[in-house]
């Protein structure tokens, strides 16, 4: 009986230790000795992983199908954020959930802090619905900063600097891996400029107010509507769109995600083609930030007659 008890206790303890070593609220298997950093959106996670792999465990909250900009954390999410070594924030009004969460200020890293003067104000705050997510409001400040790839580079540098300060023993590796990432982003920046500069007067319409930094940096001649890829626009929205085309003769509508076939067909009846330029705020189903941006380059070349 005593032998059975000891064996059972030992097995239980070993199982507990094994589960604790690999536990991770994001479903990842990680070592218990790595520092944990949370990122408020996928671009920041990607940047941080590129800089710090394999030294830091960089995690995303469980957003599900929700846009990270309008995510509201559960009590479990808040606890995980409070226990993290650092929390990377986009800034520019991106994290509306911060108003309802108490986190140690010493662990918060606002990656856009050094270019606040370059924030783009929205013409007006707008409230609308994203399907099952319910109503939400776009703030008075545009927040998809990383679509200006020069600003993405600055966010990368901010992550590198705080990691180097927090874990100075790894500074050399952080700097080296950051340098490689910055070169890739700078090459993408140059490619976008080259594509658009061939004919910047081409009129386009953006499906959603998330392309402000992109349009500003690269000089796109764009106007914006508030449409969702899988929600058929109302009659009033179609009428507003037709009115817009009266003064802005666009032939392309640029979407965040693949629109429904019914929307595509209706647009084609108006001689409007659809193309997807994914901001990549959430983790893609396949590939990574770099591969999504490569697909975006293909889409952009199509719009500008280079494909």
Set out the residue ranges of the language-model regions.
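Positively charged n-region of N-terminal signal peptides that target proteins for export
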Residues: 1-4
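Bacterial N-terminal signal peptides
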Residues: 7-15
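Extracytoplasmic metal-acquisition and chelation regions
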Residues: 17-307
């Amino acid at each position: 009986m005593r032998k059975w008890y000891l064996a059972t206790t030992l097995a239980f303890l070993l199982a507990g230790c094994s589960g604790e070593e690999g536990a991770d609220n994001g479903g990842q298997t990680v070592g218990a000795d790595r520092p944990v950093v949370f990122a408020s959106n996928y671009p920041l996670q990607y940047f941080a992983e590129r800089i710090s792999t394999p030294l830091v465990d960089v995690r995303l909250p469980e957003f599900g199908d929700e846009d990270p900009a309008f995510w509201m954390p559960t009590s479990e999410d808040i606890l995980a954020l409070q226990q993290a070594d650092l929390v990377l924030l986009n800034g520019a009004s991106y994290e509306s959930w911060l108003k309802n969460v108490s986190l140690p200020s010493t662990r918060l890293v606002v990656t856009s802090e050094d270019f606040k003067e370059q924030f783009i104000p929205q013409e007006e705050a707008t409230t609308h619905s994203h399907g099952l997510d319910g109503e939400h409001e776009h703030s008075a400040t545009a927040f998809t900063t990383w679509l200006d790839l020069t600003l993405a580079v600055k966010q990368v540098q901010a992550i590198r600097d705080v990691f180097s300060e927090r874990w100075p023993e790894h500074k050399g590796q952080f700097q080296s891996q950051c340098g490689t990432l910055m070169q890739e982003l700078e090459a993408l920046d140059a490619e976008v400029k080259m594509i658009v500069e061939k004919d910047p007067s081409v009129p386009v319409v953006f499906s959603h107010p998330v392309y402000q930094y992109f349009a500003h940096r690269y000089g796109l001649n764009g106007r914006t509507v508030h449409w969702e890829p899988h929600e058929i626009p109302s009659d009033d929205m179609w009428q507003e769109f037709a009115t817009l085309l009266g003064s802005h003769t666009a032939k392309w509508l640029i979407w965040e995600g693949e629109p429904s076939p019914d929307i595509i067909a209706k647009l084609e009846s108006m001689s409007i083609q659809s193309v997807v330029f994914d901001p990549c705020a959430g983790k893609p189903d396949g590939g990574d930030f770099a591969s999504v941006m490569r697909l975006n380059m293909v889409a952009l070349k199509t719009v500008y007659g280079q494909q």
